[in-house]
Swiss-Prot record:
InterPro entries: MT3. It comes from Malus domestica (Apple). Belongs to the metallothionein superfamily. Type 15 family. GO terms for molecular function: copper ion binding; zinc ion binding. Metallothioneins have a high content of cysteine residues that bind various heavy metals. It comes from the Eukaryota. This is Metallothionein-like protein type 3. GO terms for biological process: cellular detoxification; intracellular copper ion homeostasis. Signal peptide: none annotated. Keywords: Metal-binding, Metal-thiolate cluster.
């Protein structure tokens, strides 16, 4: 069974690295006020312009959406 990581073929799609930014929204409520905090994770790493689809799959010929 094979998965697909954008245009990279991976043995298991769960090994695909999520590309782009991901946002986590945390709402903290205190007595009379609330504070909204958004954490932004860095984009998934690219190695010399090549996709890395996890530890078991290194894609050397894909373009990573470029």
């Amino acid at each position: 069974m094979s998965g697909k990581c954008d245009n990279c073929d991976c043995a298991d799609s769960t090994q695909c690295v999520k590309k782009g930014n991901s946002y986590d929204l945390v709402i903290v409520e205190t007595e009379n006020r609330s504070m909204d905090t958004v954490f932004v994770d860095a984009p998934a790493a690219e190695h010399d312009g090549k996709c890395k689809c996890g530890t078991g799959c290194s894609c050397v010929s894909c373009t990573c959406g470029h």
